[in-house]
Amino acid sequence: MDEYEAQLLVVKQALLVTSDEQQRDELIALQTNLEELLALTRGSEPEATSDTKTPETSDNIDDELQRFQSELIDLEHQQADPGEDQQRLEELRTKYNGLLGEKCSAPHEHSWGALSYHNALICGVDDELIVDKNGILDVRLRVLFTNPTHREMLPCNYFLEGECRFDEVRCRYSHGALVPGSSIKDYKAPDFHRLARNCSVLAKLQDRLWHRGRVLCVNFVEQQCRVRLDGQEHKERERDFPFEELFPLVTAEDDDLTSESEESNETDGSDAGNDSDMDDFEAARQARMVELSLFTFKPTERLGAWEQYTRGIGSKLMANMGYIHGTGLGSDGRGIVTPVSAQILPQGRSLDACMELREAANGDKDYFSVERKLKRAQRRQEAANEKAYERASKRTDVFAFLNTSVLGQGSQQTENANKKTKPNNLQQHSNKTLNVETVRIADDIRRKQRDIAKVQQSLARNATDAQLQKRLNVQLQAQKQELATLQAQETSLCKEQQTRKSKNKMFEF
């Protein structure tokens, strides 16, 4: 009893001297424990006199006494050697300053008491020493969580820019969490190869928080993933996320599988000869499959022609799975090479009738092939297009006559020959056709005149730019030449119309 009272007196004296808030909190807690222990000891004195005190109670009190004495010794040691504490603080600060800017995995205690580790970024070192649960001096680090799941973990944007007007206590967002340096773990990089159906992930939403969800499907080519978010508060539960906004969660089973794979890798690494043998075997298999694709494959059509309907996504997926172009499917490369062709049987005919039709065609397996029918229809359409083009090329209209006969740029002999063979093809057209062509040419002339006016305005506006002036002059000359061509065509049409009017007047009596 006297020892407890002496220890309580020492604690009270230490409270009067100590100014550090953390040490004062520890001393106050120690004072409370000592007072409770004294109260229990006074209450157990009658039982001790009557020999009813159990061995377990005495052992517990002795353990608590030893623990309190060790804590008092630590406090006295800290008060007695401030220089040593300062030296220890400098050593820890030097050690942790080299970790500034590094990624790590830091603990976070939620409001309901649960403790979980999250990826974070070390951004500072605290200036005060602390005593961890093992009684070892340590320093707290200030970390910012990179995948915040709750609002108290969300970093303050204004604090990162140095413009936050609130302190750490009043700000609704995080200015960095203080965690002991000994509790820091290695950074867990996201492993996107784990992404698969029903895989648990964290997905980043517009509120900058990472919400839990489960994977529905993964596209490793475009690096996108469809996730169904947990909880009923999300209006759109199923969304598409890029890989940059996802973080695959590692479960206990995945850790076990990873540890087993690491152990197997260590076992395999001890036998380098077996690895080299496996590599040689894989290389030989690849060479054999390439040989099969070069010497045994006799294509009847262009390899991969079916990809014109799929934008090439099929070949990309097969290449990611290890497929070698030109080889068959399967591990030995002896499967089919060309895709299975679709077959459409005649409507309303039985299977026996369809088999008879195929036998009548000498057993042609592709007799009902859709691709063959499409190719046959395509060839027919191409032949029809060629015939239509030939008919259109032989047909002579007013513009063809004006371009070739009246305003052609060929030699004089060609013009003379055209004049001998076709003295005036405009006479073959009706008055209605000539009137329509006259109106069209007049519209083209007005449009061309407007274009020339715009080019001239550009020349006047950009008089100082030599390169632009040169290009505009070339464009102006081309426009004027086209205008002259149109005016010549209009003159020819007007002359033909005037000739017809004169003939009509001559025949009138």
Curated annotation (Swiss-Prot):
Cellular compartments annotated: Nucleus
**Domain called G-patch: residue spans:** 310-356
Cellular component per GO, a single term: nucleus
Q: PROSITE patterns per the record?
A: G_PATCH, ZF_C3H1
Annotated region Disordered: where?
Answer: 41-61, 254-278, 410-433
Q: Note the zinc finger regions (C3H1-type) by start and end residue.
A: 155-178
**CDD domains membership:** Tudor_ZGPAT (cd20384)
Q: Which GO terms describe its molecular function?
A: DNA-binding transcription repressor activity, RNA polymerase II-specific; RNA polymerase II cis-regulatory region sequence-specific DNA binding; zinc ion binding
InterPro entries for the chain: G_patch_dom, Znf_CCCH
Which UniProt keywords are present, listed alphabetically?
DNA-binding, Metal-binding, Nucleus, Repressor, Transcription, Transcription regulation, Zinc, Zinc-finger
| Comp. bias intervals (Polar residues) | 47-58, 423-433
Query: What is the documented function of this protein?
Result: Transcription repressor.
Could you identify this protein by its name?
Zinc finger CCCH-type with G patch domain-containing protein
Q: Which organism is it from?
A: Drosophila mojavensis
Q: Cite the source lineage.
A: Eukaryota, Metazoa, Ecdysozoa, Arthropoda, Hexapoda
